[in-house]
Amino acid sequence: MGVERIKAAFENGKKAFIPYVMGGDGGLEILKERIRFLDEAGASIVEIGIPFSDPVADGPTIQRAGKRALDSGVTVKGIFQALIEVRKEVQIPFVLMTYLNPVLAFGKERFIENCMEAGVDGIIVPDLPYEEQDIIAPLLREANIALIPLVTVTSPIERIKKITSESEGFVYAVTVAGVTGVRQNFKDEIHSYLEKVKSHTHLPVVAGFGISTKEHVEEMVTICDGVVVGSKVIELLENEKREEICEFIQATKQKEEA
């Protein structure tokens, strides 16, 4: 399915709620169970983190989750195996969030073959500059897997146009300067930034980094096409507050009807 499965998540004005889970945090059975839960709860896409020892874009919550996964001996191969197994049960799109190093260490051809086998639909590589994306972009295109671009508040318009013109899936618009994590509120210029990104791409635009309340979700999906919630979802899963994740999903869906 690949790119088409991601496109379907945004069809007919749908707003996407994209939770992030760290692959292997709590073990691989827990990963499969969490994906099943998020699928049943109505999440649009699930973003699965590949743990890495030097996660430069991650805030403390995601760093701790990655460290727990690595300390427990979880491997990239193990995560792929878990995804292969759970893919038989769910149709929710899978997007991997991985730094470049694990891809190259695993072998990029082998990594992408495993993505295909596991039914991965897209990949986000936060430390892969646009200028160097040919390291993996041609292989991903061949495999019908979206290489999802990140744009930031400081990205000039021309760069946003260039980055998004050749991309597939959706555009990940980073809503804060700095790392991931929970924020209290967003500055007014974030609204104009998101509108600017939307006006310069044909792809759906999803806001991420720092989104941690229902009010944040409602605010963001009035402007763009969806949200990624990472640190807060990890906290809620850890503390068994799953009903709050369902409330986030409900807040997203309500904006479809508004």
Curated annotation (Swiss-Prot):
Recorded superkingdom: Bacteria
Gene Ontology, cellular component aspect: cytosol
One of the record's GO molecular function terms: tryptophan synthase activity
Reactions this protein catalyses: (1S,2R)-1-C-(indol-3-yl)glycerol 3-phosphate + L-serine = D-glyceraldehyde 3-phosphate + L-tryptophan + H2O
Enzyme Commission code: 4.2.1.20
Pathway note: Amino-acid biosynthesis; L-tryptophan biosynthesis; L-tryptophan from chorismate: step 5/5
Keyword Disulfide bond set for record: no
Active site residues of this protein: 47 (proton acceptor), 58 (proton acceptor)
Keyword Lyase applies: yes
Pfam name, any one: Trp_syntA
Keyword entries, A-Z: Amino-acid biosynthesis, Aromatic amino acid biosynthesis, Lyase, Tryptophan biosynthesis
HAMAP family: Trp_synth_alpha
Family recorded in the similarity comment: Belongs to the TrpA family.
Subunit-level organization: Tetramer of two alpha and two beta chains.
Entry function: The alpha subunit is responsible for the aldol cleavage of indoleglycerol phosphate to indole and glyceraldehyde 3-phosphate.
PANTHER family: TRYPTOPHAN SYNTHASE ALPHA CHAIN, CHLOROPLASTIC, TRYPTOPHAN SYNTHASE, ALPHA CHAIN
Protein name per its UniProtKB record: Tryptophan synthase alpha chain
The encoding gene: trpA
